[in-house]
Amino acid sequence: MANVLDELLDRGYIKQFTHEEETRKLLENEKVTFYIGFDPTADSLHVGHFIAMMFMAHMQRAGHRPIALLGGGTAMVGDPSGKTDMRKMLTKEQIQHNVDSIKKQMERFIDFSDDKALIVNNADWLLDLNYVDFLREVGVHFSVNRMLSAECFKQRLEKGLSFLEFNYMLMQGYDFYVLNQKYGCKMELGGDDQWSNMIAGVELVRRKAQGDAMAMTCTLLTNSQGQKMGKTVGGALWLDADKVSPFDFYQYWRNVDDADVEKCLALLTFLPMDEVRRLGALEGAEINGAKKILAYEVTKLVHGDEEAKKAEEAANALFSGGADMSNVPTVIISKEDLGSTVLDVIAKVKIVPSKKEGRRLIEQGGLSINGEKITELTRTLNDDDFKDGSALIKRGKKNYNKIEIQ
């Protein structure tokens, strides 16, 4: 039987191991319980989390048991990893709302039936910790000198690192220990930016529990230039259909750079690797067919088959000059909005994230209505724009929205 590690390596998921040979043997010989932590600082996951969930799904399909750890407790502190400033503090109520929303999203990707996977919240054990006991039982195993040399703290020392954030590594390490004791968890998976925190957890479990503990990091989703993927004009590429429509989500993947198609197919779909390599090797006009497959497969996983088909049909209709516009993302305005500037309206209904961004689009010639380029910031919406019952807004080269009047 093939080791899931070979599949993960072949697809390009794994960046680093704490104990590579031990990890390989463990995955060959046992059904391993492992965990990935998710920071509930927003009420939706984004595409950066999606790669972690695909990592989990491949492991689960190979017979291993995932634990999705929602950081309801650690979110009260804030993770300094990769940040140059202290994060905004969230209230307990905000964090709980985010935890509840994320749970619902995760259930679309991971099978939680019959104890095949677990969702737990570290608030359940962190919020009631006795601080003195925690220092005696956990703090004693951490060297401050070594912590300060960790990459996640180095970046913050010049600007100032609060003692609150300094505790984060201990708390994340303690999470691994609790999951090890309670559920037999032996492995942590996570983003490569979490490497220092993950090492701390592995070492804590090995010292306190005297048992197996290991970690491996997942590559971050970057393009061929090394820049993080998943950013749009409106911000992050959220998995929530209310934040980013299935059509816009589909279009994002339909428009990735040719050089990124194979990597995205490998990391974000379940297509066999032979097919991934075949599609990734296509050139010229043929690579567009591979991009359509990528967009459809990723949208299907995130939003379901029906929404993926609708997005595909809408894109085909738009780019072939077809008439079916029913699946293009639609916003509703009132008759009172007629006479307002196009800029004011598209900002009001969130077609663009702000008037500043809308102004930039117009000034750069990137906004049109019904095929007519908007060249003046003072251009107003009028009845003529809605002769066909709706107005079609185009942002950039391939982003569309319909405006209808109610």
Curated annotation (Swiss-Prot):
<dbReference type="InterPro" id="IPR036986">
    <property type="entry name" value="S4_RNA-bd_sf"/>
</dbReference>
<comment type="similarity">
    <text>Belongs to the class-I aminoacyl-tRNA synthetase family. TyrS type 1 subfamily.</text>
</comment>
<feature type="binding site">
    <location>
        <position position="231"/>
    </location>
    <ligand>
        <name>ATP</name>
    </ligand>
</feature>
<keyword id="KW-0694">RNA-binding</keyword>
<dbReference type="InterPro" id="IPR054608">
    <property type="entry name" value="SYY-like_C"/>
</dbReference>
<dbReference type="InterPro" id="IPR002305">
    <property type="entry name" value="aa-tRNA-synth_Ic"/>
</dbReference>
<dbReference type="InterPro" id="IPR014729">
    <property type="entry name" value="Rossmann-like_a/b/a_fold"/>
</dbReference>
<comment type="function">
    <text>Catalyzes the attachment of tyrosine to tRNA(Tyr) in a two-step reaction: tyrosine is first activated by ATP to form Tyr-AMP and then transferred to the acceptor end of tRNA(Tyr).</text>
</comment>
<feature type="binding site">
    <location>
        <position position="172"/>
    </location>
    <ligand>
        <name>L-tyrosine</name>
    </ligand>
</feature>
<dbReference type="InterPro" id="IPR024088">
    <property type="entry name" value="Tyr-tRNA-ligase_bac-type"/>
</dbReference>
<dbReference type="InterPro" id="IPR024107">
    <property type="entry name" value="Tyr-tRNA-ligase_bac_1"/>
</dbReference>
<keyword id="KW-0030">Aminoacyl-tRNA synthetase</keyword>
<dbReference type="GO" id="GO:0006437">
    <property type="term" value="P:tyrosyl-tRNA aminoacylation"/>
</dbReference>
<feature type="binding site">
    <location>
        <position position="35"/>
    </location>
    <ligand>
        <name>L-tyrosine</name>
    </ligand>
</feature>
<comment type="subunit">
    <text>Homodimer.</text>
</comment>
<dbReference type="Pfam" id="PF00579">
    <property type="entry name" value="tRNA-synt_1b"/>
</dbReference>
<keyword id="KW-0436">Ligase</keyword>
<protein>
    <recommendedName>
        <fullName>Tyrosine--tRNA ligase</fullName>
        <ecNumber>6.1.1.1</ecNumber>
    </recommendedName>
</protein>
<dbReference type="InterPro" id="IPR002307">
    <property type="entry name" value="Tyr-tRNA-ligase"/>
</dbReference>
<dbReference type="GO" id="GO:0005524">
    <property type="term" value="F:ATP binding"/>
</dbReference>
<keyword id="KW-0067">ATP-binding</keyword>
<keyword id="KW-0648">Protein biosynthesis</keyword>
<feature type="short sequence motif" description="'KMSKS' region">
    <location>
        <begin position="228"/>
        <end position="232"/>
    </location>
</feature>
<feature type="binding site">
    <location>
        <position position="168"/>
    </location>
    <ligand>
        <name>L-tyrosine</name>
    </ligand>
</feature>
<dbReference type="GO" id="GO:0004831">
    <property type="term" value="F:tyrosine-tRNA ligase activity"/>
</dbReference>
<feature type="domain" description="S4 RNA-binding">
    <location>
        <begin position="340"/>
        <end position="405"/>
    </location>
</feature>
<dbReference type="InterPro" id="IPR001412">
    <property type="entry name" value="aa-tRNA-synth_I_CS"/>
</dbReference>
<dbReference type="GO" id="GO:0005829">
    <property type="term" value="C:cytosol"/>
</dbReference>
<dbReference type="Pfam" id="PF22421">
    <property type="entry name" value="SYY_C-terminal"/>
</dbReference>
<feature type="short sequence motif" description="'HIGH' region">
    <location>
        <begin position="40"/>
        <end position="49"/>
    </location>
</feature>
<dbReference type="GO" id="GO:0003723">
    <property type="term" value="F:RNA binding"/>
</dbReference>
<keyword id="KW-0547">Nucleotide-binding</keyword>
<keyword id="KW-0963">Cytoplasm</keyword>
